[in-house]
Amino acid sequence: MITKMPVRLLSLSLLDLRDKSVMWDVGFCTGSVSVEAKLQFPRLEVVAFEKREAGKLLMETNSRRFGCPGITAVIGDFVEMPLENYPVPEAVFIGGHGGRLKEMVRKIALLLPAGGTLVFNSVSEDSRVSFEEAVAGNGLVLEQTVRLAADRHNPIDILKAVKR
């Protein structure tokens, strides 16, 4: 699923990338958030994780199409994979979680430095509550929630957590 432009731009704004050097995009799907981040911040190192094999080709195609090479696409189950070979993120966007949101947040919270940001777009009450619970239980503070209705249907809650 492609993250719609208003949602993507607000998510990137909440990630506060201007003084950061490494961003992770977990569950990147088509890579729209990674590509937009790289376009806005060309020096930003972007590491994008996706479970589905087809994601790699989508990321390559989209990064080439929009002229932003240098995004590292990693294919595999984020929760299960070792992450020590990747640069430590200062900002993380969760685009997809495959029903394992709490496990993802736990793993990310262990890696984020103090002041690091985590942004999640919730399309359901259940996923919003799950994110809030995961944040509270893993040393993160929910700093901001923005409800965005890009159209008349399907409002999206964009949640920002920060590691203290």
Label each residue range with its predicted role.
Residues 103-117:
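A short glycine-rich, Lys/Arg-flanked "PGG" loop and its adjoining helix->strand segment in the class I
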Residues 21, 44, 116:
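Glycine-centered, small-residue-biased loops immediately flanking beta-strands
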Residues 43-49:
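Short beta-strand element of Class I
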Residues 49-88:
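S-adenosyl-L-methionine
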Residues 30-42:
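Conserved SAM-binding loop of SAM-dependent methyltransferases across substrates and taxa
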Residues 2-19:
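Conserved alpha-helix/loop element of class I SAM-dependent methyltransferases that forms part
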Residues 125-164:
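Active-site capping/gating segments
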